[in-house]
């Protein structure tokens, strides 16, 4: 029979105690919180260059005079996705004078959430090739945009930016 080494037995015992310990003094590894990204453009620039452009495409596609065959469904999908992605940009702020203030307000976040929900609705309508659902999504998008503009952007245009629509 082999004789066990007292040093090895002690090492195993200490290791087991450490493994079964209370965890005090153990450093937890948590994912690092990313530093918030702030765009090098203003929220208004995002609205004019991306949101307005995408929303108008959806509104034009949802025109009741169109037939489902006439609608460019893949383009509607692309514009709905652009709107969904823009929602994130609308919550991060930017270089505009009011951007930092807007993104902290619950009303602002509510309007962004409404825009996002309408955009997801438009995306689903496009994927289903459903003109009626696209019209409903367009109406909801108008409601979120107009409500937000009335509260946060009563004087159009701001920052000297204009859109072609």
Where are these regions (language model features)?
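Extended hydrophobic/aromatic-rich secondary-structure runs
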Residues: 4, 21-24
């Amino acid at each position: 029979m082999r004789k066990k080494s007292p040093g090895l037995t002690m090492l195993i015992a200490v290791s087991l105690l450490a493994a079964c310990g209370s965890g005090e003094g153990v450093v937890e590894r948590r994912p690092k919180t990313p530093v918030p990204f702030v765009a090098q453009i203003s929220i208004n620039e995002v609205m004019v260059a991306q949101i307005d452009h995408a929303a108008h495409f959806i509104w034009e596609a949802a025109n009741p005079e169109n037939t489902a065959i006439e609608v460019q469904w893949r383009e509607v999908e692309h514009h709905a996705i652009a709107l969904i992605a823009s929602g994130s940009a609308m919550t991060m702020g930017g270089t505009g004078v009011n951007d930092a203030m807007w993104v902290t307000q619950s009303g602002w976040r509510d309007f962004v959430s409404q825009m996002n929900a309408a955009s997801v609705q438009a995306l689903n309508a496009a994927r289903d090739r459903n003109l009626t659902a696209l019209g409903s999504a367009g109406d909801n998008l108008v409601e979120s945009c107009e409500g937000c503009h009335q509260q946060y952007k009563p004087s159009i245009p701001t920052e000297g930016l204009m859109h072609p629509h």
